[in-house]
Every structure is written in C-alpha cells, then in structure tokens.
C-alpha cells in the first residue's frame, strides 16, 4: 500500500501520456477508488471509505490546483475562493473572513473584487491556490500548476508552494519541467504501470 507522508513534496514528472499520472492523482484526491491495494491518507485507509466519506475527505483534507485555474469567470476572486467553504456549510461571514486571509496569504489582498478576466495568469493561479488552501488541507494536489505561466510567475507559485510545505502542507505535483521537479524532496516517474522514485538530498 501507499502512505502519504506528512510535510513532503513529491513530484511526478516526465511520465508518458497514458502512464497513469491522472489516475494516481484522482485516487489520492479521493475522486476515484483504487481497484486493488490500499491508500493511507493522514492515518485513514481511503480504500475502506464510502463515497460520502470520500467527499468529506476532499472538502476537509485536500486542495486541488489545476493548470488552467478552473475559476468561475463571472465570480470575483473572493467569490471563487469562498466556493469550498460554501460547499462545507461555513457561514457567510466566516467564509469571507477566511477567503480574505487566504487571498492575503497569496499576495492578492488588493485584488479580492477582481474577476478572472481582470487578472494575469500568475494572479489567476494564485487565486486558485488560495481556493485550494482556504479549508486548511493536509495535502495539495497540483496538476501542471506552472504549465500555463511565464517563468517569473512560475517561480512565484513555487515559492508559495515551498512556504506552504514549510508550514506542514504535503504537496503532490505533476510537472514536465525539470527545474520545477528539482525543487521537490522526492520525484517519481511512472512507466509501464510502475513508479520509479528518487529522493532528493536536503540542503
């Protein structure tokens, strides 16, 4: 079985199309169930969870960051970040307070009322990260989070990920960028249905 260790950055890179990257992310993200084996997340055996339990785990313990941001175009940055809290049944006043803190955390305190069309690519990704962390997840899943960004914006996102990791958030990320992958504590390649892992020495 696989256990997701706390406070780790693991990067999946250079794996060919169809190798299972997305399937692995979906299983870790409690979107799909594995057909065999076990997944232990924060001490809980996910393979034994019902659909409702998996939904609760997604809301409470997992944040998702996508390459193309997946923001609602007609909603402000504040409203986009509030969405997970709305699904979790958090009262409106608390939702806005927590969303404001998350947006401040990613350096967008002055862009809360802006809609996605008024933001740069890097700013959109930071809104997406704020949305992912507003529920204080144990693990952050990021699928090519810098793939649609210029190098400067990509560096800013990775600095933010490093800061979150230092605070105890585990990060599982897919990337084809060797430089981005080198920042992780562990890299994994998936080939022919097998995972090949490499630990990165800490400095």
Where are these regions (language model features)?
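Conserved ABC ATPase "signature" region
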Residues: 44-45, 86, 93-110
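Conserved ABC transporter NBD signature motif
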Residues: 37-45, 151
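Conserved catalytic motifs of ABC-family nucleotide-binding domains
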Residues: 136
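Helix-to-loop junction immediately C-terminal to a conserved catalytic motif
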Residues: 29
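Conserved ABC ATPase signature
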Residues: 115-125
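Short coil-to-helix segment of the ABC ATPase nucleotide-binding domain corresponding to the Q-loop/switch region
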Residues: 75-83
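Single conserved hydrophobic/aromatic residue that forms the stacking wall/gate
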Residues: 1-8, 12
């Amino acid at each position: 079985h696989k256990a997701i260790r706390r406070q780790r950055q693991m990067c999946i890179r250079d794996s060919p199309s169809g190798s299972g990257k997305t399937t692995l992310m979906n299983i870790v993200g409690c979107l799909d169930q594995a057909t065999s084996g076990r997944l232990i997340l924060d001490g809980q055996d996910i393979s034994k969870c019902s659909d409702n339990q998996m939904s609760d785990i997604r809301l409470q313990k997992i944040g998702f960051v996508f390459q193309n941001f997946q923001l609602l175009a007609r909603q402000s940055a504040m409203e986009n970040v509030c969405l997970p809290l709305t699904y979790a049944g958090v009262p409106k006043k608390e939702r806005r307070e927590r969303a404001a803190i998350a947006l401040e955390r990613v350096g967008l305190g002055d862009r809360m009322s802006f809609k996605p069309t008024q933001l740069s690519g890097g700013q959109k990704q930071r809104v997406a990260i704020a949305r992912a962390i507003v529920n204080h997840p144990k693990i952050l899943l990021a699928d090519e989070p810098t793939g649609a960004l210029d190098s400067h914006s990509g560096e800013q996102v990775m600095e933010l990920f490093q800061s979150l990791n230092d605070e105890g958030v585990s990060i599982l990320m897919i990337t084809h960028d060797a430089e981005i992958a080198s920042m992780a504590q562990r890299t994994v390649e998936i080939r022919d249905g097998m995972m090949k892992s490499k630990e990165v020495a800490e400095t």
